[in-house]
Amino acid sequence: MRNTTTDRTTAEAAPDYLFESGSRLGAVHLDALSTVLDRHTLSVLDALPLPEYPRCLEVGAGNGSVARAIAERTDGEVLAIDLDPGNLIGGTRVEVRQHDIRDSVPGGPYDLIHARLVMLHLPEREQILPRLVEALAPGGWLVLGDISEMPAAVALPEDGDRAVWDRYAHAAYDIVGPQAGQSYAWASEMYERMLDAGLRGVRAEAYRPLTRGGDTSARCHVNLSIQGEGPLLRAGLSAEDLRRYREIMRDPRLRAWFYEVVYAWGRRPVPRGQTA
């Protein structure tokens, strides 16, 4: 089910993200992320003491898997927004809307706002965080998940693959990502930033699964290398290194740590004398 509304300012804006979530490759990428990350994401969300029938906002909703799960588990209403909702599927009590969170936080107040792998892509993240907090109802929860560590190879198939791995990592994470405005330091700063924004009961934890060559997380890396091929080559990575990197990711002998994803969450205070 896809009932999509479009905010005028978003439709007129030119998207400048490195990856296109609404494309065919984007759909494969989003499905892989859902497979790898959703179980842990939902374990964090399930532990929150939400009110009955909560109002929720899912920022950068991707394919909508988390938004649909929130609606199903809480019986609440979920607004699922994305800059490119081409692969965003809604559902019962899930409204899909094209919207750029850099422009504003739509609607509210919310009992839950969740954003996974969103803020690290936004150079305006420091300005967006207080707006998200302001959009929470008293007692509402903000949950953020972002990448803090890059993939780390444990066992590689062939001699010489370590050099290929390192050259790819340099091009992708030292050049292409930062040029696109990505911050890999943000995840380690979220806890303190949430406290600074006035949230209470702030907690954080990290999640990092092991990748095996050819599995879903490895295919996710291959997909990203295809979407980012142009910028990677312009950053100095050779076509041969790119080809070999994809072979490594498909080789069942590979063992590597996936991205480390840090989740941080906190609650907007309830004014004295008021109940959440």
Residue spans for each PLM region:
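Class I SAM-dependent methyltransferase Rossmann-like catalytic core
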Residues: 13-38
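C-terminal helical/coil "lid" or tail adjacent to the Rossmann-like core of SAM-dependent
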Residues: 25-26, 167, 202-256
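Conserved alpha-helix/loop element of class I SAM-dependent methyltransferases that forms part
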Residues: 35-52
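Class I SAM-dependent methyltransferase SAM/SAH-binding core
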Residues: 55-57, 61-104
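A short acidic, Gly/Pro-enriched loop at the edge of an enzyme's catalytic core
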Residues: 103-113
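A short SAM/SAH-binding and catalytic strip from SAM-dependent methyltransferases
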Residues: 111-126
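A short glycine-rich, Lys/Arg-flanked "PGG" loop and its adjoining helix->strand segment in the class I
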Residues: 126-141
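Conserved catalytic/acceptor-binding region of the Class I
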Residues: 143-215
